[in-house]
Amino acid sequence: MKIFIDTANVEEIRKASELGVLSGVTTNPSLIAKEGRDLKEVVEEICSIVDGPISAEVISLEHEKMIEEGRELSKLHKNIVIKIPMCEEGLKAVSVLSKEGIKTNVTLIFSSMQALLAARAGATYVSPFLGRLDDIGNPGIEVVEQIADMFKIHEIKTEIIAASVRTPMHVLEAAMAGSHIATIPYKVIIQMSKHALTDIGIEKFMKDYEKAFGENK
């Protein structure tokens, strides 16, 4: 399973990229607004850091304007993926953009049926939201499993991006459920790298080395 980072914070992206684990980036209007910067400016800078799919979301809710925005965003860089919300207007936009060879990521997926429609409309990626489904008592990972099974049975090429990831356990569950990608906040990526026994082991190694080869030896 590939790892994307879910943020518009360039510094976080730079730090995560230095770990050598990133395959792409996802952003959304809320994340862009948090940075207080122009969308195109942020996206272009992200593209200079990560050589992989970079999802940039449209803000219009009418399909013709979505298409127009998508075309403009796609001109920024070859790695741009147009992120479009799951709705009737969004499906229309995905259908047109996909026929033009523009990659799309249908977001705000909360059911396997939504994912099927998005895939058939031509979406490159679908993004089911784990955390938000969990919040309403509907295990998000079950939806990911359903989508993965359905895509496999019907040989659908659309890739699954597990989104709304809040914990390392979400990442593990997504990987085991068959998600192609998990898009993860920076803090969760860092949490994934840590374990109490690792810290204890490192401390012991250092103490043992100092004891055997310290300055006074």
UniProtKB/Swiss-Prot annotation:
Pfam families: TAL_FSA. One of its GO terms (molecular function) is aldehyde-lyase activity. It catalyses: D-sedoheptulose 7-phosphate + D-glyceraldehyde 3-phosphate = D-erythrose 4-phosphate + beta-D-fructose 6-phosphate. Gene3D superfamilies: Aldolase class I. It is an enzyme of class 2 (transferase). Signal peptide: none annotated. Pathway: Carbohydrate degradation; pentose phosphate pathway; D-glyceraldehyde 3-phosphate and beta-D-fructose 6-phosphate from D-ribose 5-phosphate and D-xylulose 5-phosphate (non-oxidative stage): step 2/3. Its main location: cytoplasm. NCBIfam families: fsa_talC_mipB. Transaldolase is important for the balance of metabolites in the pentose-phosphate pathway. This is Probable transaldolase. It comes from Clostridium botulinum (strain Loch Maree / Type A3).
